Every structure is written in structure tokens, then in C-alpha cells.
Amino acid sequence: MISRREFFVAATAAAALVADGGLPLSQLLASERLTQDDLLSFDPKGNVTLVHVTDFHAQLVPVHFREPSANFGVGEAKGRVPHITGAEFRRAFRLSDGSALAYALTSDDFAELARVYGAMGGLDRVATVIKAIRAERGDRVLLLDGGDTWTNSWTSLQTKGQDMVDAMALLKPDAMTAHWEFTLGEARVQEIVEGLGFPLLAQNVRDNEFEEKVFDGSRIFERGGVSIGVIGQAFPYTPIANPRWMIPNWSFGIRERELAAEIEALRGQGAELIVLLSHNGFDVDRKLAERVPGIDVILSGHTHDAVPEVTVVGRTLLVASGSNGKFVSRLDLDVRDKRIAGFSYRLIPVFAKAITPDPDMKAHIEAARAPFEKDLARVLGTTDTLLYRRGNF
């Protein structure tokens, strides 16, 4: 619930705006027109394009998802990206108050701005974005899914994740890693992986008896004439954060030494670029970049951080792509002599009103939701105030 102080500040600001002869916020912002071409505009660079999506949480359709108003960093993480919010975040990334990106990336004036800019995400819009990038960049594109994909919606609960599995089959990622997927249980996860059509990579998931890998730890892909080694890092604390009985025979952990060995093995096989597809969370990934040499790019998931610029840690590029289908990350790389000579990045906001739905994905979503339409349309209650995720606590 909004505090008395927050209400007073908001009410005072709104009154001042009108008293000064200004227009209501929604009318002031209506002039910022969003187009699909503008959202997809990008100055291409180099020979590799990494496209990253993560933490869909089975959200097939557009959502109103407010970014947190509090994001507490502990110790050395305090006050550093991504542990800044609101006005501080907007100052750090030079975002104008009330702009489309301010709405997408921060929490202030969320309800009012939502009336202007609308919902975000939707797998049919995400599909349009990804198809456009693939059409532009061809065989340079590597699409990677950071996990938390198959579960957490009503339709995914009813279908044991099959609605999202089928949606991702249309999206055609080259690889994925996992976290909440494991709450489907070992047998169901194995069943899905066997028919997935692309690898689930997780170097840090081992069977309890022999400590052997349950899934492939890594895979080499050729893109744009570059050999790319992709390592999967599933959420390391799954048995703690989720019920242990769901994955009784598997162990997790960060497995830093094993990760270093995986990097060395990939380099030995000729990999010119090492990408960690991670569900560790941003702070753990930043620490890994400091501690484990040889990682060129970390695509970070789990903590839902949407960061509009690359975070550079030594020689590692760290990318955080948000959640719930609100964003697609595009990272163009100029790879030469087994190193990154240059890069260009954009966190693409998926404004549902501005992006044309992909017809194939749209048809799948409608078919997947149709058997549950009565449940999905049921009104459970009405709130007096906005409900939202408070933050990371």
C-alpha cells in the first residue's frame, strides 16, 4: 500500500502541475509516439549478434509489470547497478521523467504512465522482435533463453509447462538454462528436454550418486564465422529456494572450479568467444566475472534486473534483460583474434501497442489459452490501490 508520505508527494506534484497551467500528465506524454521501427532501430556492428531473453515466467500475453521501488544491495553492492531505483536510476541512465523508457524501467507514476504507454511484453510481440533481428543479421544471430520460462502462469500450471514449451519451439532459441523449470519435477523436466529440439545447458547440475552432469554443460555454436562456446549455469540454490522433494536426486551450487574447467575445455576445442548463460542473479554474476577468468559475456537472469547499458567487469560484458517478456537484449559483437574488439548494445523495450504480433505465435497463444478462458476471465477481487511487486525483499 502507498504510504501517506508517498501519497502526499504525488498529490502535491500533480496539483502543482495543474496549478502551473500545465496539462495532466497523460496529455503531456501523448506526444511521444512509439513505433516498431523506432524500437527496433539499431546500428549493426561486428560479426556476432547475441539475443537474450530471460524470466518469462510463462507470461504469454502482455502484462502491466511495475519495476521495483526498492532494490537493496548488501555490502559492496549497495548503491551500485542494479541496486538503484526511481529518480536515481533515471539520472544514472539519462532517462527523462515520464518518458517511455522511464515507464518501462522505473516505478514512479506507474499507473498514470500505464494508461499512456500500455502493457508490455507478449510472446507474439517478442517473436516479432526476434524475427526482425534474424532477418537483419542472418547467420550471425545466437538466441539464448536464461530460464524461468516454463512455469508460473495458470495455463502453464494446467499444462505442466507445455504451453510455454510449444511457444518456445516457435521462438527457436539455440539454448536455454533453468530454475523454476525444476519445480515440474525431475521426470517431467527430462521428458521435455528429450523432445526440446535445442539443449538445456547446466554445468552446475549433477546427480547425487556419481556427481555426473544431468544435462550438457556447454555447447559450441558457429555464428558469423566465429566459434562461440556457451555454458549454462542453472540457479545454484534451487534446492533451498524451491522444495527439495521436487529434485531429490540432483545437486546444484555455483561450482566455480567446474566452471573454470568448462571454459578451459571449450577454449581447447577452438572456442573464440565464451558466453555464460546464467541464472545466478546479477550480483553473483558480477562476482563470477571478477573471480573466473576467460568469460567474455555473461547473460544474467533470475533477479529480473533490466539494465539499459552493458556493465563491464574487467574484460567481461555483463547483460541483464529484465523479466516477464518486457525486454529483449541485443548485443552485437566485433570478435577478432579470440577477443571482443568492440560491441553495441540495446535493451529493446517490448511495448505491446507499438509492435505487431507475430501471426504464428499469436495463433498458438490463442489456442493455448482457449481451454482456460473461463478461468482466466474470472474476477477474483477488486483492489482500492495498485498492487505491485515491492522490490527485492
Locate each region found by the language model.
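Acidic, metal/ion-coordinating pockets
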Residues: 2-356, 360
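Hard-cation-handling environments
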Residues: 356-393
